[in-house]
Amino acid sequence: EVIQATKIISKAINAKGIVFVVNKTFSKMEELQNCGIDNSRILIINNSKFPCGFKREIINEFNKSLKKSLPFRVSKNDLFVDSSTMYDVYKSILLKLPSIDKMVHFTGNCIYSSCLLNVKLGTSIKDIVNQIGGFEKNPSLVVINGNQTGASVSSLDVPITKYTKSVS
């Protein structure tokens, strides 16, 4: 789905090239290598270092490893899109489904088990936590979108938005 959406977006904006950024444990490397998109490359980021995945780090890593092998350059002015957004593009364009839900990863040592849920936009974190069995113990902090780059929430009444990727 992500590859199909990438083809659609790259054609729509007349992209000179595509760089897929993945971590070293990415399991579908062969699919990306055989995606059929001209001037596409895979950039493997070491996500054990902090920070990782920001535009600046991606550009720096690109300049170190791929710059010489491609007929295009990457800069902060280019389009950077994450895989969940590309999945939403796929659902909207190819399946004709509006974006009314979001895949959200719930994890942490205060819930009984980690899970990836398809959540309706606007649903509160509190409602979702109740649906997955509540808290095993009271959390000292709840963070949206990762411990390294995310933001803590002041209340569990905060809704899931189109920008929410994870809750921990």
Language model segments and positions:
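Residue-level preference for well-ordered alpha-helical positions
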Residues: S10, V129-N130
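Ferredoxin-type iron-sulfur electron-transfer modules and their immediate structural context
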Residues: K102, G134-S168
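Histidine-anchored nucleotide/phosphate-binding helix
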Residues: E1-I13
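Hydrophobic alpha-helical positions that pack around
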Residues: K16, V21-I125, I132-E136
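A general structural signal for short secondary-structure junctions and capping/turn motifs
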Residues: S10-K11, K96, P159
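Generic structural signal for individual residues within well-ordered alpha-helical segments
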Residues: I3, K126-V129
